[in-house]
């Protein structure tokens, strides 16, 4: 994972200390997310690993708690990863990763594509 994609510990929310293996199901990405991944040179597999392992990125405390509960009750799981601007080449922003409640699919997308 590029160093820029490591969220500072104070901003990262989730169950990083537990050994979580969230089933991802079929993994897909929206066209907009793929453009951002390319423009920022992101390691999408690394981000999916973080999501799968319970590192929810920069979600709110409320959303982090909801994700932790979703692991127990089978609800949807949302991670958010802030993107740095890449030297004027691409603006910063945010990338979401959502795993469906039934764990059949995980989607990488931009918040505007939700």
Task: Report each predicted region and the residues it spans.
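Short, compact, well-ordered microdomains
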Residues: 77-114
